Amino acid sequence: MESKIKHFISCIAWPGLMVLCMTMMAYGFTRDRPVLYFNVAYVILIVTLFFLERWMPHEREWTKSDGQTLANILHTLSSKGTTQLLLLFGGIIGLMGLMEDPGRGIWPRDWPLAAQVLLGVVVAEFPLYWAHRVGHEWPFLWRFHAVHHSVIKLWIVNTGRFHFVDSLYKIVPSVGLLLALGAPLAVVIWLSAFTGFIGMLTHCNVEMRLGPLSWIFNTPELHRWHHSKDLREANKNYCENVMVWDLMFGTYFRESHRRPPADIGIREFMPPRFVDQIMWPFLSQEGKQQIEVGCRLIS
């Protein structure tokens, strides 16, 4: 009986939780408090996934501690709590106020809001895709993005594990493009909320059966392939929310006949301490070697 219940939940968890969160956002807009209701929905999502990760994990081995919980939380506070909040809700929203004039830009403000949000997701995905892709293909940017890929398991707590520089070079072009086109503030808020919900679901260690959803959205299945140690699998699935540009540029990867690898991470060294991880991309080769030797002696 329990196995049937788990199977049923694995089929409805992703779409059910996404619909719940987006419905709460819609209600928040009707109450003129979208940010408050985003936070409420986000907490509900975290608590639900935390429970499901323990009851029906995708990888049982990933439920064990990797010693990175504190570093993950600090990275989340650094990248999401500082970079995104200051940039998006500070400077960006200030600029948005200047662009509320309907005569600015070429954005189709006469469209229904739902259609504008859908357009915003697809348009913003283009710079997100390329920022993520060059983060893998350009060694200078990979040194920052490697912090995220150095994890040896995926779960909700490392959703926000990004070097703050990594977050900046993704947020600025994506939101900046919407600004340049004249998108209203509501579209940016919806995009931010959708990205937050997708990110949490994408990184969760919950057994989910996604089916055709993985052809449209960035799902846990696709992102597990993206975290593979095999670069033929890892250098794929760059889209953050919807897979349109991966499909268009030939970087979509999915093999339904086998599970994504449980052995994930990077082959290069990454120090375990948060402070060292923040400094790591800026260090010389000699400085990195000194930290690596020190870490190996301690371990």
Whereabouts are the PLM-identified features?
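Short, hydrophobic transmembrane alpha-helix segments
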Residues: T23-Y37
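Membrane-embedded catalytic scaffold of the fatty acid hydroxylase/desaturase
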Residues: L74-A262
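Cytosolic-facing loops and C-terminal tails of multi-pass membrane proteins
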Residues: L247, H257-S299
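Membrane-helix interface linkers and caps
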Residues: V47-L74, G94-P108
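Hydrophobic alpha-helical transmembrane bundles that constitute the permease/transmembrane domains
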Residues: C11-P15, F51, F164-V172
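N-terminal membrane topogenic signal
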Residues: M1-G16
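Hydrophobic core of alpha-helical transmembrane segments in multi-pass integral membrane proteins
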Residues: A13-A26, V43-F50, G90-I92
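Hydrophobic core segments of alpha-helical transmembrane domains in multi-pass membrane proteins
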Residues: F38-I46, V188-T195
